[in-house]
Amino acid sequence: TKDKADSFNVQPYCIKLFRQRWYMVARGTTPKYFKMGPLIYSLDRIAEIHTTDTTFEMPEEWSASDYFDGCFGIIVGHDCDILNIKLKATAQQADYIRDLPLHESQVELERNDDYSIFGYRLRATYDFIQEILHNRENVEVLEPKSLRKQIKAVISEMKEKYKQ
């Protein structure tokens, strides 16, 4: 952890709630940070925040819905394509997923006594992969094969760590 707090100005674009935490999407005003574009800051990690008299023009082409399009949480992952993902969930886990959808694009494609299949349109970012793994053996990636292979690789690494 960092002991020294940084102080800097930003142009706030929007705030987003994810997993009971608030985040601010903002663009830094110094040349180094301005050229990086909007970044995401966790509000609970900000020690002090205040307004200034400085104003800015919100870019007309920027929208929060476009910025977070296909995102599971707050990891934007514009370097990842938006995929059509199919997850198979045990009947018990499917009840939970129905009550608390994993993503706004969630559609139940199939349902029977043993399992349900859910479809999503999103990016396979780190936080979505964590969510799949969080569901343990109760959820299986059916499509795309590339994501299934990625999950399998993570599980194999985990298995190696617990070999002994």
Each model region followed by its residue ranges:
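Polybasic (Lys/Arg-rich)
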Residues: 67-164
